[in-house]
């Protein structure tokens, strides 16, 4: 999935497959924490989520060093950057950032100095201009800085179904602006 700029049918297949994978791991009580293009392999056109190296079980107590953040800056959810608890919403944020890259071919929070990228993430300022306008509202909603504002699995899947049928992916989500 690192190549980006997938055509709509392939984008739907990858985004939907990744959404189903996240639903399965969340159902098992696991949070991946590092959903990004480099951790999604395409096998016969189907996404496979890899690298559970920093994943954790949702009920586990975290043993981390204060101030240490692990991950790729443009794909770290705001709550990871600020040291807050991670939840399934953290992975939905990573899903949206990864899907935005696949849809537009560019990282949604840009490139450049780590501090600048992290600031754009924390402020919820993705650049989705290269993304198909039919899926942009879903990605924008899932990239909300506040985890409580992000859509859940069933909302994501319903919005993706709208997108797959040529309609805007807004039917099942509230669009924040």
What are these regions (language model features)?
Residues 1-175:
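Eukaryotic protein kinase
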């Amino acid at each position: 999935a690192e190549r980006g700029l997938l055509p709509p049918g392939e984008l739907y297949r990858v985004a939907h497959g990744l959404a189903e994978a996240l639903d399965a791991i969340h159902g098992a009580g696991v949070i991946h924490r590092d959903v990004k293009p480099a951790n999604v392999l395409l096998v016969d056109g189907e996404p496979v989520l890899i690298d559970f190296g920093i994943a954790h079980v949702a009920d586990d107590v975290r043993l981390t060093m204060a101030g240490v953040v692990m991950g790729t800056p443009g794909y770290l959810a705001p709550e990871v950057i600020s040291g807050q608890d991670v939840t399934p919403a953290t992975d939905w944020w990573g899903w949206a950032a990864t899907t935005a890259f696949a849809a537009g071919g560019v990282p949604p929070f840009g490139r450049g100095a780590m501090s600048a990228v992290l600031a754009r993430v924390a402020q919820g300022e993705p650049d989705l201009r290269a993304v198909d306008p039919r899926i942009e509202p879903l990605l924008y909603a899932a990239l909300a800085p506040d985890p409580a504002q992000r859509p859940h699995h069933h909302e994501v899947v319903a919005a993706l179904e709208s997108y797959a049928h040529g309609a805007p992916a807004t039917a099942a989500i509230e669009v924040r602006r």
